[in-house]
């Protein structure tokens, strides 16, 4: 009996344990197709590989970044057989920096990928196709980003200051001295920033840096302890040379080094200027933001005698232009400080037919007085989680038209199911190319109450 027992193989409950592939391992793969996020998909020995930097039909060597169960995440290290679609990336850091994921894909193909992602989500989740597909709303491929956070970390062991952007799927910092997606006003600042910070006498106190471009250019430094005078003088001279405001973020809220300095951006078609502060949300792509507002107003088409509700209104990015067309605008935002700034923005732009309210829009709206007033149209611009609680009650507002601006096609499709159940019809939809060179999809959808 014992002789036979030695030949038996016992396995724990749950089946055979999957052998994990170690990070760093290189593997030759044939890419079958692209995933929704722009990565190549390959299949090998029962595992599905998601390979950044690859294209359908290519044969590549991929380095494993992470493996879990039957899913392997990897990065292209070498291309043996290239797709005819492949192009040279505009940035030398592409493939290492985590900021851009599809620079190797022509822009028209990037737009087609995003359009397909939106269409597939709407069809699969909501079983709906819009009555009309709008052309993609896009702008410049490069030099579009007016805001960026630069990672800074002191390596005490190596006595080295790392300055750059986070690596893909990692907390590592890729040292970077230029970034082609930044607007031109920020390019020379980014070029010289690493060298300037590395000359600090006390680099240990440095946190991240934020760069802003708008009505004014600004540099914000997060620091964990007080700056010594020599380092502060170095920073002030750097900002002065680049014509930039300096903001410091130690304890408490960020503050300008020169009292009275403010940040803001223009919406030229409506002769509006919106003030904001570090920490506030603004769209990073100024030209596509303007085009997005123009398209939203065209689609929603508010009349002079209509009341419009703007939910998740932020600083008034949509509400203020809407106020120039509608009789009355009610704008609602969850962050109290942004509600305060939005109200100030309305006053400074001499708009008196828009009112701002603070509310938790993840909760039912039935208790809010402003929700019971009745509206002709509603505009939604929610975060990635979507607006499910809002759309569940949207019919109670009386709105026959609803414009949904989405930064996540999955939650847009989920919310579309509820809107269609309430009797709304998806009249028009299209993508907004807010982040060229990435697979990130923003979208706009117009729903109208069925007659």
UniProtKB/Swiss-Prot annotation:
Molecular function (GO) terms for this protein are: 4 iron, 4 sulfur cluster binding; iron ion binding; RNA binding; rRNA (uridine-C5-)-methyltransferase activity
The reaction(s) catalysed by this protein are: uridine(1939) in 23S rRNA + S-adenosyl-L-methionine = 5-methyluridine(1939) in 23S rRNA + S-adenosyl-L-homocysteine + H(+)
**What InterPro entries does the annotation carry?**
23S_rRNA_MeTrfase_RlmD (IPR001566), MeTrfase_TrmA_AS (IPR030390), MeTrfase_TrmA_CS (IPR030391), NA-bd_OB-fold (IPR012340), SAM-dependent_MTases_sf (IPR029063), TRAM_dom (IPR002792), U5_MeTrfase_fam (IPR010280)
Tell me which residues bind [4Fe-4S] cluster: 91, 97, 100, 179
What does the record list as GO biological process? rRNA base methylation
Give the domain of life: Bacteria
Q: Residue limits of the TRAM domain?
A: 20-78
E.C. designation(s): 2.1.1.190
Binding positions (S-adenosyl-L-methionine): 283, 312, 317, 333, 360, 381
What keywords sit in the KW lines? 4Fe-4S, Iron, Iron-sulfur, Metal-binding, Methyltransferase, rRNA processing, S-adenosyl-L-methionine, Transferase
Which enzyme type, at the first EC level?
transferase
- Give TM segment ranges: none
Q: CDD domains given for it?
A: AdoMet_MTases
Q: Is rRNA processing tagged as a keyword?
A: yes
Residues of the active site are 407 (nucleophile)
Q: What family does the entry list?
A: Belongs to the class I-like SAM-binding methyltransferase superfamily. RNA M5U methyltransferase family. RlmD subfamily.
| Free-text function comment from the UniProt entry | Catalyzes the formation of 5-methyl-uridine at position 1939 (m5U1939) in 23S rRNA.
Which protein are we looking at?
Answer: 23S rRNA (uracil(1939)-C(5))-methyltransferase RlmD
**Organism, per UniProt?**
Pseudomonas syringae pv. syringae (strain B728a)
Q: Which gene carries the instructions for this protein?
A: rlmD
């Amino acid at each position: 009996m014992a002789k036979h027992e030695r030949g038996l193989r016992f396995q724990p409950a749950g089946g055979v344990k999957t052998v994990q592939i170690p990070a760093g391992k290189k593997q030759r793969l044939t890419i079958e197709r692209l995933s929704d996020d722009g990565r190549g998909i390959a299949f090998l020995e029962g595992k599905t590989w998601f390979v950044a930097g690859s294209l359908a039909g290519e044969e590549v060597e991929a380095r494993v970044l992470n493996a879990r169960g039957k899913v392997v995440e990897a990065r292209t290290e070498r291309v043996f057989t290239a797709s005819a679609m492949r192009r040279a990336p505009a940035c030398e850091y592409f493939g290492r920096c985590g900021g851009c994921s599809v620079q190797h894909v022509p822009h028209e193909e990037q737009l087609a990928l995003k359009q397909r992602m939106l269409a597939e989500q709407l069809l699969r989740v909501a079983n709906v196709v819009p009555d009309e597909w709008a052309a993609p709303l896009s702008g410049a491929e490069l030099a579009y980003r007016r805001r960026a956070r630069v990672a800074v970390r002191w390596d005490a062991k190596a006595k080295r200051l790392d300055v750059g952007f986070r690596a893909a799927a990692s907390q590592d910092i890729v040292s970077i001295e230029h970034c082609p997606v930044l607007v031109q006003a920020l390019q020379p600042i980014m070029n010289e920033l690493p060298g300037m910070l590395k000359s600090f006498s006390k680099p240990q106190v440095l946190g991240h840096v934020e760069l802003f471009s708008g009505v004014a250019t600004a540099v914000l430094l997060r620091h964990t302890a007080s700056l010594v005078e020599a380092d502060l003088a170095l920073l002030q001279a750097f900002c002065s040379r680049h014509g930039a405001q300096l903001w410091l973020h130690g304890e408490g809220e960020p503050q300008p080094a020169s009292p009275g300095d403010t940040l803001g951006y223009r919406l030229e078609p409506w002769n509006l200027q919106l003030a904001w502060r570090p920490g506030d949300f603004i769209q990073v792509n100024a030209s596509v933001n303007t085009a997005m507002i123009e398209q939203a107003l065209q689609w929603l088409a508010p009349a002079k005698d209509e009341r419009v509700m703007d939910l998740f209104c932020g600083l008034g990015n949509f509400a203020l232009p809407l106020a120039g067309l509608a009789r009355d605008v009610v704008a609602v935002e969850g962050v109290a400080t942004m509600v305060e700034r939005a109200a100030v923005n309305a006053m400074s732009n001499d708009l008196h037919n828009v009112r701002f309210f603070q509310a938790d829009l993840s909760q039912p709206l039935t208790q809010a007085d402003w929700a019971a007033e009745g509206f002709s149209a509603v505009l939604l611009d929610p975060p990635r989680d979507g607006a499910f609680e809002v759309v569940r009650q949207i019919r109670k507002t009386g709105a026959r038209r609803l414009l949904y601006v989405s930064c996540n096609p999955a939650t847009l499709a989920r919310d579309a199911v509820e809107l269609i159940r309430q009797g709304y019809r998806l009249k028009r939809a299209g993508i907004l190319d807010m982040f060229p060179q990435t697979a990130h999809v923003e979208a706009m959808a117009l729903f109208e109450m069925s007659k």
